[in-house]
């Protein structure tokens, strides 16, 4: 809350500024040509989990060799991963520094102590920002919008994509911003990262004229979200070596990656690396925008530095934006009443983003009734509450407690009242809830019901995750009879009748919504049997045991073995295997060989 008070003191000098955004362009998979799936007859089936045919390190070595070949083709010897390290990364020293920093932040004089060791770097950081800022620091409008997830094959690489720079930029933007679940395309070892590296390969002469700063920015964004910061730095170096000038978005992404990386175990504070990027901006005559200033603010670790930074922002005329406020509210776990008081004191109007932050604050404190009233209030005032965010927040809390009854009622109510359909993450949470609830005679029927609804959402695909695998393991160990299709259909029809009404969200829905007790029984949501009302309030959650560690290890080993079987061709000839994969999936034409 210290950061919030600090911001409030400067809002009197410089009120919050809104980013005036022009209507952005939505880029959807539907804009591109979809492939016709070709069945690969030679595709190996999943192998048994009882044997390990080859060591897992073999596939990792193949990936390393391919990546080294990529780096060597850049001819940039200063890149860290172009040669073997003389000495290994001192993880022990990094852990010691990070632990010391955490302990220091908990002391009474934390801010004074941290400022004393970093004041020079903070001063240089602010000075560097001044040098790359114009008189009027620009606001940034969002120009492109992408769909959150897609369950079809990735779009086909057509001649239109390969002959037009704008089409190519949109195509790369789609691959890097939309999560494609089909065959795990967007995963770390999926087809998308392989395709991106092949397209951006220095020896790919056909793509060379299509490479722009926007293309590299999108790929840096993609790897930054996967915490692959080394690849981001290599892409930045590749841009410069190929004569593609970075822009302010490039440096904002590198600073954003630095911010994400600083939250991991590190050997030093992130200020010097930030100064390096700012000095590069000065050398290349690139002006900082509001995002640059905001990102640098969140790099700071102590309130003294933050106060100086905000003072200099106001002095330089940098607008204090809502994005800065959102970041502070999300970074600290601030109670709902404190947020409301802050907004009232500083005369800040409420928008949808602030509604979301307040909603999350209430949910974290189990104030479900208040959070529901907040949503009703926002809906009547025409705020955009038709957002899966709110549904996911409820399900995240209910699933942790194993409350399948509350999860199902919440999903149904969001469909009926807010016209919000559950996302893939919502289904992940529902399967988690089923596991947390524990085994009952209805376990298999509820699982099959959720699976049918999931397939309706994904178009027939089952996107595997830990909780689905856990459900299957529980059924293999316990299930005696297989539920019929009719019984599953009846359960689904009954479950969809359960919704929250004017009574609101009640933790004791067994008592408050007694008309649904028969459905709750069928869902396996029978409360702890006791005469004590206090005991009834406490739901017994199925606790994980030591077996969980062994189970996760077995899942990992199974995945590695199946991957080895599928990627055998990549170990023999990586690029030929990649071409065959793209052709078999219809992403490129066969004559493109």
From Swiss-Prot:
One of its GO terms (cellular component) is mitochondrial inner membrane. Keywords: Membrane, Mitochondrion, Mitochondrion inner membrane, Repeat. Disulfide bonds: none annotated. It comes from the Eukaryota. It is a peripheral membrane protein. Its main location: mitochondrion. InterPro entries: Pentatricopeptide_rpt, TPR-like_helical_dom_sf. It is found in: Mitochondrion inner membrane. Transmembrane segments: none annotated. PROSITE patterns: PPR. Required for respiration. This is ATPase expression protein 3. The lineage of its organism: Eukaryota, Fungi, Dikarya, Ascomycota, Saccharomycotina. The gene is AEP3.
């Amino acid at each position: 809350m210290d950061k919030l008070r600090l911001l409030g003191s400067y809002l009197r000098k410089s009120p919050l500024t809104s980013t005036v955004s022009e209507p952005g362009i939505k880029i959807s998979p539907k804009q591109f040509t979809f492939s016709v799936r070709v069945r690969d007859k030679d595709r190996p089936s999943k192998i048994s989990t009882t044997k390990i045919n080859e060591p897992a390190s073999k596939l990792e070595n193949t990936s390393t060799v391919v990546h080294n070949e990529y780096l060597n083709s850049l001819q940039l010897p200063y890149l860290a991963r172009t040669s073997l390290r003389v000495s290994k990364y001192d993880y022990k020293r990094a852990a010691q520094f990070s632990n010391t920093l955490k302990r220091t932040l908990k002391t009474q004089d934390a801010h004074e102590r941290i400022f004393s060791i970093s004041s020079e770097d903070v001063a240089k950081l602010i000075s560097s920002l001044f040098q790359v800022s114009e008189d009027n620091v620009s606001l940034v409008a969002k120009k492109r919008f992408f769909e959150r997830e897609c369950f079809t094959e990735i779009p086909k690489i057509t001649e239109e994509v390969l002959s037009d720079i704008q089409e190519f930029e949109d195509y790369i933007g789609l691959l890097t911003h939309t999560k494609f679940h089909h065959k795990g395309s967007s995963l770390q070892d999926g087809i998308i990262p392989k395709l991106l590296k092949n397209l951006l390969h220095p020896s790919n002469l056909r793509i060379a004229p299509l490479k722009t700063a926007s293309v590299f920015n999108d790929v840096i964004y993609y790897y930054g979200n996967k915490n692959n910061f080394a690849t981001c730095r290599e892409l930045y170096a590749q841009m410069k070596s190929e004569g593609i000038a970075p822009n302010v978005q490039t440096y904002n992404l590198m600073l954003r990656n630095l911010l994400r990386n600083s939250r991991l175990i590190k050997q030093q504070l992130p200020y010097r690396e930030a100064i390096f990027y700012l000095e590069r901006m000065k050398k290349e005559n690139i002006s900082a925008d509001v995002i640059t200033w905001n990102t640098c603010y969140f790099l700071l670790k102590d309130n003294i530095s933050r106060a100086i930074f905000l003072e200099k922002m106001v002095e330089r005329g940098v607008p204090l934006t809502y994005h800065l406020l959102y970041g502070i509210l999300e970074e600290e776990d601030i109670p709902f009443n404190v947020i409301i008081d802050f907004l009232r004191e500083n005369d800040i109007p409420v928008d949808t983003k602030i509604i979301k932050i307040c909603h999350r604050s209430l949910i974290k404190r189990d104030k479900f009734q208040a959070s529901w009233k907040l949503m009703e209030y926002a809906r009547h005032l025409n705020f955009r509450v038709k957002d899966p965010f709110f549904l996911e927040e409820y399900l995240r809390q209910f699933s942790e407690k194993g409350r399948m009854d509350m999860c199902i009622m919440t999903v149904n109510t969001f469909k009926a009242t807010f016209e919000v359909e559950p996302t893939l993450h919502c289904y992940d949470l529902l399967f988690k809830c089923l596991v947390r609830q524990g085994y009952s005679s209805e376990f298999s029927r509820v699982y099959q019901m959720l699976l049918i609804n999931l397939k309706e959402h994904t178009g027939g695909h089952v996107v595997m995750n830990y909780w689905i695998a856990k459900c299957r393991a529980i059924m293999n160990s316990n299930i005696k009879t297989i539920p019929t299709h009719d019984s599953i259909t009846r359960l689904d029809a009954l479950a969809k009748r359960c919704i929250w009404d004017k009574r609101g969200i009640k933790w004791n829905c067994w008592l408050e919504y007694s008309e649904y007790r028969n459905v709750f029984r069928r869902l396996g949501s029978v409360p702890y049997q006791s005469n004590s009302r206090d005991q009834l309030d406490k739901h017994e959650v199925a606790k994980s045991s030591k077996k969980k560690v062994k189970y996760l290890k077995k899942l990992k080993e199974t995945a590695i073995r199946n991957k080895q079987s599928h990627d055998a061709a990549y170990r023999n000839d990586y690029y030929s295997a990649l071409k065959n994969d793209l052709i078999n999936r219809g992403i490129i034409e066969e004559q493109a060989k």
